[in-house]
């Protein structure tokens, strides 16, 4: 018995049989041990052959195990350590297996030869095989269906048996089983694929398109047409086999094993004489797949068959990967014919979603409104810019359905609140039960009354919830049943089983449809009452998912947000004092955007704020971010003084290829990709190099920038604010009596601005807003604001701070300089008021819950504690 004449799997089985004998304390390895180890391997050849013969594997295994238990076991001092004998029966079996291999003209003894040898066994195994109707003839018959007319010429032949079933899936069979969603549209692409497949040579289409546009769906559409026989004569009765490259490569430990597996797949396809169409999704994976030193990759193995037309192959890959992998190998590229899969339009996407609607409704057990489908297509196209239709729209609908489904399966909020309240009262009841005083007993009686009422409410709500859930599940089950019957009808019509088709079409299907209609009508009538569960997916759910994905508020305005937006101007004016024009223009731009009437291809608003230092330019941007997003952190702030050199522009959009930092992306583009709805503040723009502004032209006009990686970054949902001190000298000198800016000063400032920036840049900005220098009255308002902020910092200690009118006048007089704006005032309050308060706090003069008044005495600020 030469182990080298056996295949790897046979050797492994003999080794396992030895281990099994040792574990049972047997002195010898017998045929039953070997048979048991062959049946133990779930994916093994023996199991596959017996399954083809409809043998109950578990029962057979149990029978063999009983035979093993009958064998004598030796333990203790009588057992010879480390010695194990092979019985004569096992040796005879392996000799017979060798003869079977010779009969089949095989070079190695494989598992199937051992099985054939088992059929000639006498004794217990023979009786067991008879009980399960296992004979040599039907074993040979099953073996031929698994192995075909292949010979065993290597030590691992099992890998090449049933190669197609093992390394991929049959799309046509999946369509027949109803596992593939319907494909809507894409007729021109499917027709082009059919035309290429009908050619004599180079009949290999490759579908190229962006990720998510439906390349795989086109092939699934072709499979559906083949099932419906809606294809030319040459493609009828064909099958599409989707190759799984990862399954081919996985577990190929030895050199040549991968090539052996692939060759087995190709041979089976070749033998089918064009009946099998090979589909390789992610076609670029064949370039370099299985390539090791001195070995061939999958691409090179496919080339000869592709060129001769022996292999009908459909590939699918993205544009980038086609360019990166396939185009670099011209010999491979010329064997494929390109079919470009374009992104469908919004209208086409709506049609696709309408076709998939029923599938989603059945799977999730919900109802999808048509408005939700339209909203998913329109909103995904408008707001999710880095992905492609129809994939992103389908994802939106799927997630919205899943949201409603989880709500149906979870306890309703109203019932949850009542249940928690009951639990809380029960804990209180247990605590009060231990108390003996009159007050506690009275409270206990009141509590018990409330508890019994709540329990009654909870039980009725729970019953209502269970009933609603039951109704929803009933509708879902009926829909699933109807779907199954329709699939059976298609199958019956395809097989010309007219009796079954008539029974389904005129009997079962109408009955289920009627029952479903009644159940849905009952559900619709119940909706008039106060329902705990909702099963509708409307456009609100879709808008909510879009907002969750992108951070852009597209959901309908709730009452609180409505009021907030209408009061936006007032909110901004409270923090930015004395700049009514600027506040009004900015809040109007935001209102237009939230009302949905802004130009969808431009940013929400783009502004240049001009004015002297310290008048509220940067403060307005911060306030806007705070008002819109409840956080100043949502503001993307870029100090343009860092962009004084010409080459610094690459920091905004990312370094070009070949430079350090290319992979990292740009400071501006990456920030906006992560937060598409934000306020962008470009501070001190006149400090930047003029070349930097060329990059901003597209951002201001079309609301987009292409970064160094070639990705388009969407700025359509941003507010762009640029601040500058240009012309501040003219603004300081040119004020009217009422504090407004003189017309000639305005002209001088605009002239200076035009001299510094190019016309094409200024022409793209929505508004150029001049901030006027602050007057004394406005400065008093700013003093109040600074004191209010100080008050906020002391609020947790309940200390109030108040400045008398005289103190305010004194602070304004001493701390305000028109040239420097409000900043020196803040520093003055910090130095003169906050420092004095800090001294008193540390000294202990000011304690918690104190009232502090700041006044002026002898031309100096003093602190009084009350």
UniProtKB/Swiss-Prot annotation:
Residues 774-866 are annotated as: C-terminal. ATP 2 binds at residues 611-618. Residues 162-343 are annotated as: NBD1. Homohexamer. The oligomerization is ATP-dependent. It is found in: Cytoplasm. InterPro entries: AAA+_ATPase (IPR003593), ATPase_AAA_core (IPR003959), Chaperonin_ClpB (IPR017730), Clp_ATPase_C (IPR019489), Clp_N_dom_sf (IPR036628), Clp_R_dom (IPR004176), ClpA/B (IPR001270), ClpA/B_CS1 (IPR018368). GO terms for cellular component: cytoplasm. ATP 1 binds at residues 209-216. Residues 561-773 are annotated as: NBD2. One of its GO terms (biological process) is cellular response to heat. Residues 3-149 form the Clp R domain. Residues 344-551 are annotated as: Linker. Keywords: ATP-binding, Chaperone, Coiled coil, Cytoplasm, Nucleotide-binding, Repeat, Stress response. This is Chaperone protein ClpB. It comes from the Bacteria. Residues 394-528 form a coiled coil. SUPFAM superfamilies: Double Clp-N motif, P-loop containing nucleoside triphosphate hydrolases.
